[in-house]
Every structure is written in C-alpha cells, then in structure tokens.
C-alpha cells in the first residue's frame, strides 16, 4: 500500500525520506482529492498483466517506454536528477509504474505544502496535468519505471511559476470543486 506523508522542511539530501517526527501521514483519499491516482500491481508480470492492460485500456494509456534511473544507465545522471527534482508541471497527466527500485514523488497540496509519496516496486501513480510536483530517487539511487502516455509522449516540463497554462487553471478549478 502507498506510503505518503507531509514532508519536513529540513535542508539536506532530497533522497532522504524527510519524514517529520511525529509523522503526518497522508492517505489514499487525500491523494485522490488532489487528483492523484494510485494502483498496486504485480511488477514481476508487467509484460502480461491483465490488470495493467485493463487500466491502460480504460484510461487510454496507449504509449509506454521504460526508463532506468541510475548512474550507470542514465546518461547525464546528475543533471537529470536535478532536473527531475525541480518543481514543475506538465500539460498532460504524468503516469509512472515502478518496475524495480524506489523513489519519491512530491506533490503540492491545496495549501501549497509538500506531500511525499514513496514509490516502490509495483506502485503505479497518475499525477494530473497542472499539479506542481517533482521526483527523486531515494538513497538506493535506483528506479526502473514504465512511463505511460495518452497518445504520443510529450516530455515538456514547465518549472514553477507556470500558473498561466490552461492545464494549471483547470487543475486549480478541480481543487476548488473538491474542497
């Protein structure tokens, strides 16, 4: 099951959990109210998983590839890790399925506070278009993920501030309706 919590404000390595003591856990329902969708799947059978195929069909996730994020597999690793950790949004949903390893997606809540979502093997998440977010590997420095898209992939990230985009405006309206 997904683990998520409000992050502490401590400086330091973003690959650490940044879980405050005492913790402030976040449940699936709270993530859903932010538009974040979550599934737990069997990553060992991703190539022939009927549950994954059902999700892809229902949500029109027609394109996919696999990325391995580690120093010896990802060209310009340090540069890419910094880029992934910059707060940004996309004009389309971001869909990731962790096939191996682990990492963190951080998303902003309605009050602009960071919620950290721990992602490990078998976790699949959809972040809605317009949500400010970022990603980092954890201290293991290894994540293998399936990237899914509706139609042709669009890789463009818009660093904050990016409130002028229609996708952001639609997301803010969505948040107001879930209040």
Curated annotation (Swiss-Prot):
GO molecular function: acireductone dioxygenase (Ni2+-requiring) activity; acireductone dioxygenase [iron(II)-requiring] activity; iron ion binding; nickel cation binding; oxidoreductase activity
Region (Disordered): 7-26
GO biological-process terms attached to the record: L-methionine salvage from methylthioadenosine; methionine metabolic process
Transmembrane parts of this sequence: none
Cofactor(s) demanded: Fe(2+); Ni(2+)
Keywords in alphabetical order: Amino-acid biosynthesis, Cell membrane, Cytoplasm, Dioxygenase, Iron, Membrane, Metal-binding, Methionine biosynthesis, Nickel, Nucleus, Oxidoreductase
Catalytic activity, as annotated: 1,2-dihydroxy-5-(methylsulfanyl)pent-1-en-3-one + O2 = 4-methylsulfanyl-2-oxobutanoate + formate + 2 H(+); 1,2-dihydroxy-5-(methylsulfanyl)pent-1-en-3-one + O2 = 3-(methylsulfanyl)propanoate + CO + formate + 2 H(+)
Residues that coordinate or bind Fe(2+): 88, 90, 94, 133
EC number(s) per entry: 1.13.11.54, 1.13.11.53
Function noted in UniProt: Catalyzes 2 different reactions between oxygen and the acireductone 1,2-dihydroxy-3-keto-5-methylthiopentene (DHK-MTPene) depending upon the metal bound in the active site. Fe-containing acireductone dioxygenase (Fe-ARD) produces formate and 2-keto-4-methylthiobutyrate (KMTB), the alpha-ketoacid precursor of methionine in the methionine recycle pathway. Ni-containing acireductone dioxygenase (Ni-ARD) produces methylthiopropionate, carbon monoxide and formate, and does not lie on the methionine recycle pathway. Also down-regulates cell migration mediated by MMP14.
Subunit structure: Monomer. Interacts with MMP14.
Similarity section: Belongs to the acireductone dioxygenase (ARD) family.
Matching HAMAP family: Salvage_MtnD_euk
Protein name: Acireductone dioxygenase
Gene name of this polypeptide: ADI1
């Amino acid at each position: 099951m997904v683990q998520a919590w409000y992050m502490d404000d401590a400086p330091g390595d973003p690959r650490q959990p940044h879980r405050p003591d005492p913790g402030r856990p976040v449940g699936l329902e709270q993530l859903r109210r932010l538009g974040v969708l979550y599934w737990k799947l069997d990553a060992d059978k991703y190539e022939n998983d009927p549950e994954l195929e059902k999700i892809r069909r229902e949500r029109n996730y027609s394109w996919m590839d696999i990325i391995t994020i580690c120093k010896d597999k990802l060209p310009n690793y340090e540069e890419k890790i910094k880029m992934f950790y910059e707060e940004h949004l996309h004009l389309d949903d971001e869909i990731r399925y962790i096939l191996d390893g682990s990492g963190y997606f951080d998303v902003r809540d309605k009050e602009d506070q960071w919620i950290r979502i721990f992602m490990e093997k078998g976790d699949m998440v959809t972040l809605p278009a317009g949500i400010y977010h970022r990603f980092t590997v954890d201290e293991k420095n290894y994540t293998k993920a399936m990237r899914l898209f509706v139609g042709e992939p669009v890789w463009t990230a818009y660093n904050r501030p990016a409130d002028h985009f229609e996708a952001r405006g639609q997301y803010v309206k969505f948040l107001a309706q879930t209040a």
